[in-house]
UniProtKB/Swiss-Prot annotation:
Hydrolyzes ribosome-free peptidyl-tRNAs (with 1 or more amino acids incorporated), which drop off the ribosome during protein synthesis, or as a result of ribosome stalling. The lineage of its organism: Bacteria, Pseudomonadati, Pseudomonadota, Gammaproteobacteria, Pseudomonadales. This is Peptidyl-tRNA hydrolase. The gene is pth. GO terms for biological process: protein quality control for misfolded or incompletely synthesized proteins; rescue of stalled ribosome. It comes from Azotobacter vinelandii (strain DJ / ATCC BAA-1303). Keywords: Cytoplasm, Hydrolase, RNA-binding, tRNA-binding. GO terms for cellular component: cytoplasm. It is found in: Cytoplasm.
Amino acid sequence: MTAVQLIVGLGNPGPEYEQTRHNAGALFVERVASAKGVRLSADKKYFGLVGKFSHQGRDVRLLIPTTYMNRSGQSVAALANFFRIPPAAILVAHDELDMPPGTARLKQGGGHGGHNGLRDIIAQFGNQNSFYRLRLGIGHPGDKNLVSGFVLGRAPRSEQEKLEACIDFALDVLPDMLDGNWTRAMQQLHSRKA
């Protein structure tokens, strides 16, 4: 059971990307910070917004990279290397095209599935992909040529509400994730109906 030491929320920086589908991971970390009473602050050393809270006597760090999505690994590696956090103690929250809005799944390892943020993190860790992922469903536009505009667009209210509900449920499961009780966290999260 590997306990989480770092939670990363992927997204793009700037007001033009706020509330876009691609920023679902960043929204999750913002919600964690709010629930834990943590103020995220910019730190140039880690190329992101960072925060920290205590869980059962140990530090858990939060990170939202302020690099663009395809350079997320620069931020994650900078913080993880400084604090000597192994990939298996990292949870990366990100948007997932291949799942409908309102669904969330946990996974350890695997490829990047075309997600540029995951691709860069894996590359920065020297192809070590043992970090955990919280995959937040955003749906698919139905045509691969429409993906870029889709992920960079804002979801209609009904989809956004589903995403926010699944993030709230993931927050309920967070204590198990933090403790490394991955099987129990997966059972709870994966049994939820969107």
